From Swiss-Prot:
Catalytic activity: ATP + protein L-histidine = ADP + protein N-phospho-L-histidine
Statement: the UniProt record of this protein carries the keyword Transmembrane: yes
EC number(s) recorded for this UniProt protein: 2.7.13.3
Function statement: Member of the two-component regulatory system RC0948/RC0849.
GO CC annotation terms, alphabetical: plasma membrane
Lineage: Bacteria, Pseudomonadati, Pseudomonadota, Alphaproteobacteria, Rickettsiales
Enzyme class: transferase
Keywords, ordered alphabetically: ATP-binding, Cell membrane, Kinase, Membrane, Nucleotide-binding, Phosphoprotein, Transferase, Transmembrane, Transmembrane helix, Two-component regulatory system
Compartment(s) of residence: Cell membrane
Protein name, UniProt field: Putative sensor histidine kinase NtrY-like
Species this chain originates from: Rickettsia conorii (strain ATCC VR-613 / Malish 7)
Molecular function in Gene Ontology: ATP binding; phosphorelay sensor kinase activity
Length: 599
């Protein structure tokens, strides 16, 4: 029963229907969540419910997609064991995350409700009311005082207006008697101060807003808010046009600061209380992102952890595939695994591959010996061919011209034939000996740019009908090499290029040195006839040539020298005409080889 359930559950999880269903549900619930959040009257419980459903859907979808991805790539780099471990890590991360999310949101909601308890709100509101009542009481008292002073001044205004000194004295008496910090009588028509108490600040109608003056004209008692530390009241004197009384009383700075602090704290508290739903929503969204991040971290950790387990087996499988493809130089690193069963398997595998490599090397040596035997036979055959006309010519000389030399022209022709075929023999034997007995390179530090440039200049003097061009991206370069062999390589390549240009009117040969990172390239290009397509793949093999001169071992020698110098020889035809030969040396490998030979 359990196996049947597991099998069907696995097939259901792997089906596209489930993925499509989850993706559709994710889109629908995401849109619904956005709609609920955007409503003016937000229901926090509904929003949290939608967010938790979104989290659950996304986590399940992530697990299913991960399982689907690894199943799809099962035949490539992943293994079934790795897939199972990664899926297990995903489930272990997803299920607790959902549970923790639900409880975290619930407890966060309880904590927030405790912060904004009704008792705290009541205390803050009462504090604001007390502070505002204090200021209101001061304003009420000042209003009553302003009305009383205005009444007194209105009764005495006719007598006081003609005696400014008496007006000022009376105004000061009123201010002292009623505990006013300032008292000013203003005339709007003349825009002047008629009288003021001693402690009053200079003031004009320009500093009083026009709408307040209009209210005062209507008989209202108006508050003038020009200084936060002072309460001022403006009133028009009865029966006197354009005459106004302004009284003021200072409020203690500590009280003002306390009132401002109380109002500020209450405003901030109420603002935070109004924003609490948004804060809870943001917290929930942040928690969802953290949960998804944890899921991805769990998957990543599962991949890394599984790779550590499966990596040794994968290396062994890869090495086996390389051996199957014919690479007998592959070895698995024994020092990277523990001394367990896998370590024993590594040791046995390496020993087996070394034995196979040794046997193959012995076989190659035997085949090479047979090849050299064929070479010797071919060389002997090539030597015998020019010897036959030499022998015949010598016999003819002996029989026909031994008594005396009468026909001089014919005699010279025979001699030229002997010389020509003798030179052929000399060239054949020289090339064979050079190829068969090429000495090991003796590495010394040489200036490569100077070496190549002077070879090019020397060939230019010998072939003035060919346009030579030399370029280098460095002025000089110290190169570990056997200068004699490198010289031989360049001469061989340039001679081949010159021979391919023979018969052309505008021959051109370019030699380029390019140093880049840990590699240096020497490139030779020409506009000659190039290589025949059927021979370009085996141009560096022995006895492959398109020339009537020599045995075709020149490029074979070049290849051997280049490989001895940790280089790669690349031969190709140009798109337009001619050939391009690129020699790329690995400087790091070359330095290591030179150091090994010095030891």
């Amino acid at each position: 029963m359990l196996s049947y359930l597991k099998q069907n559950l696995h097939s259901y999880f792997s089906s596209r229907v489930l993925i499509f269903t989850l993706a559709t549900a994710a889109i629908i619930f995401a849109c619904a969540t956005f709609y609920v959040i955007s409503l003016e009257s937000k229901n926090f419980s509904t929003i949290i419910g939608f967010l938790l459903v979104d989290l659950a859907i996304f986590l399940i979808l992530g697990v299913v997609l991960t399982q689907k991805f690894f199943t799809k790539n099962n035949n490539n780099d992943s293994s079934k064991l790795q897939n199972r471990i990664v899926i297990a890590f995903s489930l272990v991360a997803a299920i607790p995350t959902i549970i923790v999310s639900v409880f975290s949101v619930y407890f966060f909601n309880l904590s927030v409700q405790a912060w904004f308890d009704k008792k705290i709100s009541t205390v803050l509101d009462q504090s604001v009311i007390v502070a505002e009542s204090y200021i209101a009481e001061h304003k009420l008292q000042l209003k009553e005082t302003a009305l009383a002073v205005a009444e007194d001044l209105s009764d005495m205004y006719y007598d006081l207006i003609h005696n400014p000194a008496l007006f000022t004295k009376t105004l000061n008496t009123e201010a002292e008697m009623r505990s006013l910090d300032e008292a000013i009588v203003l005339n709007k028509s003349t825009n002047t101060i008629v009288a003021n108490s001693y402690l009053s600040f200079s003031l004009s109608f320009a500093t009083i807003p026009a709408h307040l003056i209009k209210k005062a004209d209507l008989g209202e008692l108006v508050e003038v808010k020009s200084d936060p530390t002072k309460i001022r009241m403006l009133i028009k004197l009865k029966e006197y046009n354009d005459v106004y009384l302004l009284v003021g009383r200072l409020v203690d700075n500590k009280i003002i600061d306390h009132v401002d602090a109380t109002n500020g704290a209450a405003a901030e508290y109420n603002s935070l209380k109004n924003e609490i739903d948004n804060i809870q929503i943001k917290f929930s969204i942040m928690f969802i992102f953290i949960a998804l991040l944890l899921l991805f971290v769990a998957i990543s950790f599962g991949v890394i952890f599984t790779a550590k387990i499966v990596k040794p087996i994968k290396k062994l499988v890869t090495a086996t595939d390389n051996v199957k493809d014919g690479d007998l130089t592959v070895q698995v690193p024994e020092n990277e695994v523990d001394k367990d069963e896998i370590g024993t398997l590594y040791v046995a595998f390496n020993r087996m591959i070394k034995q196979l490599s040794r046997q193959q090397r012995d076989l190659v040596i035997a085949q090479r010996a047979m090849a050299w035997s064929d070479v010797a036979k071919k060389v002997a055959h090539e030597i015998k061919n020019p010897l036959t006309p030499i022998l015949l010519a010598s016999e003819r000389l002996l029989k026909k011209f031994s008594p005396e030399i009468k026909e001089r022209v014919e005699f010279e022709n025979y001699l030229k034939m002997i010389i020509r075929h003798t030179n052929d023999i000399k060239n054949i034997v020289s090339e064979f000996v050079l190829f068969a007995r090429l000495p090991a390179p003796k590495f010394t530090k040489s200036e490569l740019v100077y070496l190549v440039k002077h070879i090019v200049e020397a060939r230019k003097l010998l072939n003035d009908h060919i346009l030579y061009k030399f370029e280098s991206n460095v002025e000089q370069f110290d190169f570990m090499c056997d200068a004699t062999q490198i010289n031989q390589v360049m001469i061989n390549l340039l001679k081949n290029a010159e021979e391919s240009i023979e018969g052309r009117e505008s021959g051109k040969i370019e030699v380029t040195i390019d140093v880049k990172d840990d590699f240096i390239s020497v490139i030779v290009t020409d506009n000659g006839k190039g290589f025949p397509p059927e021979l370009i793949g085996k141009a560096t093999e022995s006895y492959v040539t398109t020339s009537s001169k020599g045995m075709g071992v020149g490029l074979a020698i070049v290849k051997r020298i280049v490989e001895e110098h940790c280089g790669i020889l690349d031969i190709a035809n140009r798109e337009a005409e001619g050939a391009i030969i690129d020699i790329k040396f690995d400087l790091k490998e070359l330095d290591l080889k030179a150091k090994r030979l010095e030891m």
